[in-house]
Amino acid sequence: MSVYRDESPATGLDHLKAALLYPLPHHAISRMVHWAVRVETPWFKNLLIKAFIRVFKVDMSEALEEDPTAYPTFNAFFTRALKPEARPLPDDPDAILSPADGTISQMGPIERDTIFQAKGHSFTTAELLGGDEALAEEFRDGWFATIYLSPRDYHRVHMPMTGTLRQMIHIPGRLFSVAPFTVRTVPKLFARNERVACIFDTDRGPMAVVLVGAINVGSIETVWAGEITPPAGIRAQYSNYEADNAPTIARGHEMGRFNMGSTVITLQNSRPAPGKIMSAHIKQGMTI
């Protein structure tokens, strides 16, 4: 694995844009998005889809269904499947894979229990995992990767390595944007936003895959539980899985998806051999 650390300072414009987000009714906006992207009226959903493809320059040649009008809703288009050959896995069976298309925001060692967010900002593993100190201790001095999914990216999340689900935690919170300007300005952003933390046991020890919500994320889904958000509660909801009902998901297989875009954070309890990252822009299935 490689180390990638972006210490770009926040600008005055970053702070201004972030300040405008605080008073917004985050969950109300997300509920409206949740409704709008599921409208099946042909002219409406086709207008949204075609405008989105044009504005964000979406490459439909990778999609399993290339015809934009074939999708029953905007959400079906947004969470579209890709052709199997679009994301080939590396030949090395031990390589740890990127769980998603996107941009690496940060990647590197967990310093004791602290995860680097941006210059001047950090949060702890316990804060990210809903305050569970015992669970957080499993990732002490481990490794993390934070990947930002932009609107144009593929929005299904896949397994970095094979794992058996131990626990899923739905943690309530705000729904700030997770665009780079908020990462640079909002303290403890990923530990404040609503999120779903999925804890897996792997051959290399525990692994967490945390799906972080954002202001336009209509919902988060996993392949074993279906749609998890909305609604948003006021307390963390824990789902524990025993050996007889715990799904095992193979490396590279889908484990969840964002219905609109956001951020994925992965945690491991050991530090891999050092490597060199060639680009912060990655695709699902690439070695990280």
UniProtKB/Swiss-Prot annotation:
GO biological process: phosphatidylethanolamine biosynthetic process
Cellular component GO terms, alphabetical: plasma membrane
EC number(s) per entry: 4.1.1.65
PTM annotation, UniProt: Is synthesized initially as an inactive proenzyme. Formation of the active enzyme involves a self-maturation process in which the active site pyruvoyl group is generated from an internal serine residue via an autocatalytic post-translational modification. Two non-identical subunits are generated from the proenzyme in this reaction, and the pyruvate is formed at the N-terminus of the alpha chain, which is derived from the carboxyl end of the proenzyme.
GO MF term set: phosphatidylserine decarboxylase activity
Pfam family, one: PS_Dcarbxylase
Compartments in which it is found: Cell membrane
Pathway annotation from the record: Phospholipid metabolism; phosphatidylethanolamine biosynthesis; phosphatidylethanolamine from CDP-diacylglycerol: step 2/2
Key word Lyase present: yes
Main subcellular location of this protein, as a coarse class: membrane
Active site per UniProt: 101 (charge relay system), 158 (charge relay system), 262 (charge relay system), 262 (schiff-base intermediate with substrate)
Catalytic activity: a 1,2-diacyl-sn-glycero-3-phospho-L-serine + H(+) = a 1,2-diacyl-sn-glycero-3-phosphoethanolamine + CO2
Cross-referenced InterPro entries: PS_Dcarbxylase, PSD-B, PSD_type1_pro
Membrane topology: Peripheral membrane protein
Site (Cleavage (non-hydrolytic)): residue numbering on this chain: 261-262
Modification type Pyruvic acid (Ser): residues: 262
Protein function: Catalyzes the formation of phosphatidylethanolamine (PtdEtn) from phosphatidylserine (PtdSer).
Subunit: Heterodimer of a large membrane-associated beta subunit and a small pyruvoyl-containing alpha subunit.
Family of this protein: Belongs to the phosphatidylserine decarboxylase family. PSD-B subfamily. Prokaryotic type I sub-subfamily.
Name of protein: Phosphatidylserine decarboxylase proenzyme
Gene source species: Alkalilimnicola ehrlichii (strain ATCC BAA-1101 / DSM 17681 / MLHE-1)
